[in-house]
C-alpha cells in the first residue's frame, strides 16, 4: 500500500517534520496550553497520530506562543518573534475571493484572521487582500 503525501500545519516553533515526529511524545500539552483551541491532536493513523496540528480554516493560530513552552520534549521550540514562526504562507485564490470576484465587496475574513495582518497580509487599494 502506498502512503499518501500529507502535510500538516504544525504549531509555531515545530522542528522539521522528520525530527518533529521523532521528538514529539504525543502528550497533548501544547493543545492544552492553547487558549484559542487552535492546536489540536491529529486523529489519524501512522506516526502522525496524536501529534499537534493547526487547521487555520477552522480555528486560526493567533501566535500567542503558549504552546512551545508547554512542550516537554522539545518538539516545539520557543520562537523569539512572530515573524520567525514560519508556519507557512497564505495564498489568495482570486477566483474564490469575494473582493476579487465582485467589485465593491468588502469581505475581511482572511485579513481579520491573519495574526500578521499589515505585514503578512495587506489590503491593496484599500480592500483587495494580498500576501
Language-model region placement:
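Non-ligating segments of multi-cofactor redox enzymes
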Residues: 1-131
Amino acid at each position: 500500500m502506498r502512503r499518501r503525501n500529507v502535510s500538516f500545519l504544525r504549531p509555531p516553533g515545530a522542528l522539521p517534520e522528520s525530527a518533529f515526529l521523532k521528538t514529539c511524545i504525543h502528550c497533548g500539552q501544547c493543545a492544552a496550553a492553547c487558549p484559542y483551541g487552535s492546536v489540536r491532536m491529529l486523529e489519524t493513523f501512522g506516526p502522525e497520530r496524536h501529534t499537534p496540528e493547526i487547521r487555520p480554516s477552522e480555528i486560526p493560530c493567533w501566535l500567542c506562543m503558549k504552546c512551545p513552552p508547554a512542550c516537554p520534549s522539545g518538539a516545539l521550540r520557543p520562537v523569539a518573534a512572530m515573524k520567525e514562526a514560519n508556519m507557512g504562507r497564505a495564498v489568495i485564490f482570486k477566483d474564490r475571493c469575494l473582493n476579487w470576484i465582485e467589485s465593491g465587496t468588502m469581505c475581511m475574513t482572511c485579513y481579520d484572521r491573519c495574526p500578521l495582518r499589515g505585514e503578512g497580509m495587506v489590503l491593496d487599494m484599500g480592500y483587495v487582500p494580498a500576501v
